Amino acid sequence: GATDLWVYDLSRDAASRLTFEEGGEDWPVWSSDGRFLYYASDRRNDGTIFRRASDGTGAPEEIATTPQGIWPLAASHDDRWLAIGSVGGSTSTDIQRFDLATRAITPLVETPFLDQDPAISPDDRWIAYASEQSGRWEIYVQALGGERGRWQVSNEGGQRPRWRADGRELYFFIRPDRLMAVDVEPGA
C-alpha cells in the first residue's frame, strides 16, 4: 500500500508530511548533517532511491535506480556516500556503497547470506553489520579501504550494531532485551 514519510519537529511538537507521491516510500536515512533524507520508493516497481531536503523544500531528487530492489541503510559521516541494501544476483541481500558524487554502486559486503543493518564508524574507516553466515545473526566488522579483512565481534548472536560517537565502542542487541558493548581500539 501507499506509505509516506513524515518528519517530527521536537522543538515545535509538530509533524510535517515529507512525501506525497503514489506508491510507498520507506527506509528513511538522515544525512549526517541533517539537511537531507534519503529514502526508497516503489512507485515504479523498481529499486529507486530519492533524496529530499529534510525541511520539505524543493522537489524529491531521484539519485539511484536499479531493476532490482535497493534501499538506503546509512550515510557516511562525511556525507559523500551511502551504504545501501540490494537484492538480486547470486546472493540474498548485500550491502553496497553508493557514491553520491559519481552515482557509482560498488560492493561493500557481498556474501551468499543475508547481510543487513550496517553502521559506519565515526571516522568512516569501518563498517559493522549483521550477517547470518554462521547460521544465526552475528555482528561483523570490516575495513572500508584497501584490504577488506572481516572480523566476527559477537559470539552469542547479534543485530543492529551502532558505534559510540567517538568510535571506541560498538553496541548491538543479542535479543530485544539484551544490549552488548565491545571495546574498539582507536586507529585499529
Predicted regions and their residues:
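Short loop/turn segments that connect beta-strands within beta-propeller blades
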Residues: 9-13, 53-57, 99-103, 143-147, ...
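C-terminal structured "cap/appendage" subdomains that terminate the fold
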Residues: 166-188
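Conserved beta-propeller blade repeats
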Residues: 20-42, 61, 66-85, 110-130, ...
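Long hydrophobic segments that form regular secondary structure
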Residues: 98-101, 124-126
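Structural motif
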Residues: 2-6, 45-51, 90-96, 135-140, ...
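Acidic, glycine-rich loop-and-beta core segments that form the ion-binding/anion-interacting portion
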Residues: 81-83, 93-100
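Alpha-helical solenoid scaffolds in eukaryotic macromolecular assemblies
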Residues: 6, 56, 122-125
